[in-house]
């Protein structure tokens, strides 16, 4: 697929703290957070003017789903816009708490595990053609996805019975099967529930739920960009080596616990390979593919970062990507802190630092401290992120949805929207079904808006 539709959904961890003690239950905090949303949207599940969806997910986790994007750079920008929107709700909720005499700070974390060991996710969505063999897609993707954490994990200090260890992925401990149609009970690598949110005869939506949430813009670019390249190769019929894993679930944990990328995992054919071996195989194929077919600036940037990350892991010279890959950035931050204060990895102060990296409050979060210092590379910029808070991508269906919502709100009309429907709740109940996510212009929608 030359042009692909991408979408990211991020669930956020939420807590309210007063002098180090939890003051409100996550449920109550979430209600405060969403009070402003409910006051104008009459619901805690709304679509916004930028085409995105914001809602309270299972277990009081605020979730932001980006609008449909057809470029990875746009996707990164819109994912960050979601962070800013939630940061705005946080500031608003803290103010309201103070007015009600409840002292405390609300924290929103863009991470994947809380201290109680609960996991919440970052889900990636890729539009793929309906004609292909979905089973083959999964077969080729799973070894790639299991080992991909070595290039785009968010990193985590894991407390184990044998002491603390630094893992490259947060999600890996919580994945229980390879391919499944459930997302919460047993967490699979690829979710097959067939809701394309598009013309079902032409498209399928590949729903990848194994990835970590990223703070780093460049890590996000690599995560989605490399996956897109792998999908393009599968779609083009590139012959891939059979790297089917004997036990993907055991492998995903083994890979996560090995920062060197050298630990061997068993393949179904009886051979063994390390996460580095497997990633190098996919990277090599992708590089040949782009060398032969040509690629845009984004594809070249993705390949460059992919190669450097693999080299950094292989040589142990993590400085090569310390400004670009989340788990490396965080690992070096923790190591510097430990050396300075002579702390063991199991220290609560290290756990605090680990968490603070994911704080989305720009005046408080450690990732944003690094960004202000110019210590991390970027893909987008603050102006584009600010714009994306209210302006949808202009080249996809999100433009139609965003425009419809904006006009209906300005005219104070009652409306209902989802990913494919735009409906005016008047006597005529006029509804437009937008089945093509690539279409940013539609005269039926223009007519609907004009008739408000």
Curated annotation (Swiss-Prot):
Q: What are its E.C. numbers?
A: 6.3.1.19
Q: Which reaction does it catalyse?
A: ATP + [prokaryotic ubiquitin-like protein]-L-glutamate + [protein]-L-lysine = ADP + phosphate + N(6)-([prokaryotic ubiquitin-like protein]-gamma-L-glutamyl)-[protein]-L-lysine
Protein keywords: ATP-binding, Ligase, Magnesium, Metal-binding, Nucleotide-binding, Ubl conjugation pathway
Q: Name one GO molecular function term.
A: ligase activity, forming carbon-nitrogen bonds
Catalytic residues? 57 (proton acceptor)
Give me any GO biological process, just one: modification-dependent protein catabolic process
One of its Pfam families is Pup_ligase
Instruction: Indicate which residues the UniProt annotation says bind ATP.
Output: 53, 66, 419
Q: Which InterPro entries match?
A: Pup_ligase, Pup_ligase/deamidase
Write out the pathway annotation from the protein's UniProt entry: Protein degradation; proteasomal Pup-dependent pathway; Protein modification; protein pupylation
Keyword Nucleotide-binding found: yes
**Binding positions for Mg(2+)?**
9, 55, 63
Query: Which EC class is this protein assigned?
Result: ligase
Role: Catalyzes the covalent attachment of the prokaryotic ubiquitin-like protein modifier Pup to the proteasomal substrate proteins, thereby targeting them for proteasomal degradation. This tagging system is termed pupylation. The ligation reaction involves the side-chain carboxylate of the C-terminal glutamate of Pup and the side-chain amino group of a substrate lysine.
Q: Which HAMAP family does this chain map to?
A: Pup_ligase
Other notes? The reaction mechanism probably proceeds via the activation of Pup by phosphorylation of its C-terminal glutamate, which is then subject to nucleophilic attack by the substrate lysine, resulting in an isopeptide bond and the release of phosphate as a good leaving group.
Family assignment from sequence similarity: Belongs to the Pup ligase/Pup deamidase family. Pup-conjugating enzyme subfamily.
Q: What is this protein called?
A: Pup--protein ligase
Please give the organism: Thermomonospora curvata (strain ATCC 19995 / DSM 43183 / JCM 3096 / KCTC 9072 / NBRC 15933 / NCIMB 10081 / Henssen B9)
């Amino acid at each position: 697929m030359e042009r692909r539709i991408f979408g990211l959904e991020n669930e956020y961890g939420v807590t309210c703290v007063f002098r180090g003690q939890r003051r409100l239950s996550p449920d109550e905090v979430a209600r405060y957070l969403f009070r402003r949303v409910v006051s104008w949207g009459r619901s805690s599940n709304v679509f916004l003017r930028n085409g995105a969806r914001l809602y309270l997910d299972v277990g009081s986790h605020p979730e932001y789903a980006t609008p449909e994007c057809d470029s990875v750079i746009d996707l990164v920008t819109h994912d960050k816009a979601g962070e800013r929107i939630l940061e705005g709700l946080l500031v608003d909720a803290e103010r309201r708490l103070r007015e009600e005499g409840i002292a405390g700070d609300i924290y929103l974390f863009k991470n994947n595990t809380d201290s109680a060991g609960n996991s919440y996710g970052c889900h990636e969505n890729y539009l793929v053609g309906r004609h292909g063999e979905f089973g083959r897609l999964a077969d080729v993707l799973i070894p790639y996805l299991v080992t991909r954490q070595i290039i785009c994990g968010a990193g985590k200090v894991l407390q184990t019975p044998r002491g603390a260890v630094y893992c490259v992925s947060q999600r890996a401990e919580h994945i229980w099967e390879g391919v499944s149609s459930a997302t919460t009970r047993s967490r699979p690598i690829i979710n097959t529930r067939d809701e394309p949110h598009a013309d079902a005869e032409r498209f399928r939506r590949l729903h990848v739920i194994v990835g970590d949430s990223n703070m780093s813009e460049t890590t996000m670019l690599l995560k989605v960009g490399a996956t897109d390249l792998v999908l393009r190769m599968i779609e083009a019929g590139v012959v891939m080596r059979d790297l089917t894993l004997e036990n993907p679930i055991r492998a995903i944990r083994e890979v996560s616990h090995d920062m060197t990328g050298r630990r061997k995992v068993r393949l179904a054919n009886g051979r063994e390979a390390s996460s580095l071996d497997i990633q190098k195989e996919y990277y090599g194929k992708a590089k040949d593919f782009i060398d032969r077919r040509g690629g845009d600036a984004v594809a070249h940037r993705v390949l460059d970062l992919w190669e450097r990350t693999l080299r950094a892991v292989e040589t142990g010279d993590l400085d090569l990507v310390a400004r670009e890959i989340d788990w490396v950035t965080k690992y070096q931050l923790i190591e510097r802190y430990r050396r300075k204060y002579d702390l063991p990895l199991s220290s609560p102060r290290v756990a605090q630092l680990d968490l603070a990296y994911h704080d989305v409050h720009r005046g408080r979060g450690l990732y944003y401290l690094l960004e202000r210092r110019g210590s991390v590379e970027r893909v987008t910029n603050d102006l584009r992120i600010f714009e994306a808070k209210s302006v949808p991508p202009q080249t996809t269906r999100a433009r139609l949805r965003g425009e419809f919502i904006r006009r209906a709100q300005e005219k104070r009309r009652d409306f209902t929207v989802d990913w494919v429907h735009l409906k005016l709740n008047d006597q005529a109940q006029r509804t437009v079904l937008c089945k093509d996510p690539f279409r940013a212009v539609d005269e039926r929608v223009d007519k609907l808006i004009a008739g408000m």
